[in-house]
């Protein structure tokens, strides 16, 4: 069934434009409230948000929807996405909501939904919500005496800080470690510096003054240049780059070099395998993860299971097949021993634990394999289905033939933006670049002609 509202990570779009309007947000609250409320019992939703200005608008619309459906609402304020998932369980809520567009610019926003177990909702429930939104909502409203209440709660941010701190082994301290944290002017701007400082690190914080429109603006995990310069400038041991909702993380070593999610997963996989903590005989990643990671794991008799892009698909595969480590090259790292979704802070703490335990610099700990030359480019489209175009199909087939068995080609539409992502990797860098550029040119040409 075709989706109209939900993408790979909830509902997302430009604020005040379809589908990210107050009207639709209110209907989402009504539909979700009706599905998850417990008949004859008090039911509860928790709502968190990042630091986008439009978060206030969508928060109020969701509150109207949930309370109209008979649910009480706890408002958590600016807080990381993984904290919402954790607090959904901790506060015995029936549904958790995060208002965020993750790493996107401030003018975008989104709605992510978590069930009472802290996991993202299934495709079936999302389709049920869509069907309800498009119909008459009147039958789903609560009676006069059952309308819900809403209140803003204080202090729950500290529950999450304590939870994150407990994931660092008690025998390991961060004393003497100089850490620069790039908070992306987002949801992690309070929790990440506080947790690291309480664990003993010397913390230098950048991009921790959100104003509603500077989230992810030339900062955070998608723009780590400022962090690289800061780490080098203050001679820090490590830099930690979060994204707008703090569910992904990249590191910067003491030399100012970026360490991506593939390298971070390699560190955790090797460490946990050595201590018999790794489950499933390997890890789960997406089709975008580097071939070098797969070879690294194979050399250690560990497997790499690949899924479609999107941390929800990684988590689904982990749950179905018994893995406890998974993630994406972009920095979504899912450690199911601790969390139900990607968690930037907790993932960073696991890497710091390995470095402290081995008494080695981050550059030594996190350079586990030589990545195969890989190139990812995006091409913006103007609608239609360019991947079904004959010329585009022909270009893709030709590219696969040229790469042969020495590389991989992944082409997919973005689930959150009007983009086609083209990625190729292989041992021949020149060939990889040629293949990607040729496909980009054809898609651009055909998309323009169809506009």
From Swiss-Prot:
A Pfam family of this chain: PGM_PMM_I
Residues carrying Phosphoserine: 102
Catalytic function, reaction form: alpha-D-glucosamine 1-phosphate = D-glucosamine 6-phosphate
Positions bound to Mg(2+): 102, 243, 245, 247
Active site: 102 (phosphoserine intermediate)
Cofactor(s) this protein requires: Mg(2+)
Keywords (A to Z) from UniProt: Isomerase, Magnesium, Metal-binding, Phosphoprotein
Gene expressing this chain: glmM
Record-stated family: Belongs to the phosphohexose mutase family.
PTM summary: Activated by phosphorylation.
GO cellular component: cytosol
Protein name from the UniProt record: Phosphoglucosamine mutase
GO biological process, one term: carbohydrate metabolic process
Top-level taxonomic group: Bacteria
Purpose: Catalyzes the conversion of glucosamine-6-phosphate to glucosamine-1-phosphate.
Enzyme Commission code(s) on record: 5.4.2.10
Presence of the UniProt keyword Isomerase in the record: yes
GO molecular function, one term: phosphoglucosamine mutase activity
InterPro entries named in the record: A-D-PHexomutase_a/b/a-I, A-D-PHexomutase_a/b/a-I/II/III, A-D-PHexomutase_a/b/a-II, A-D-PHexomutase_a/b/a-III, A-D-PHexomutase_C, A-D-PHexomutase_C_sf, A-D-PHexomutase_CS, Alpha-D-phosphohexomutase_SF
Cofactor binding description: Binds 1 Mg(2+) ion per subunit.
PANTHER family: PHOSPHOGLUCOMUTASE (ALPHA-D-GLUCOSE-1,6-BISPHOSPHATE-DEPENDENT) (PTHR42946:SF1), PHOSPHOHEXOSE MUTASE (PTHR42946)
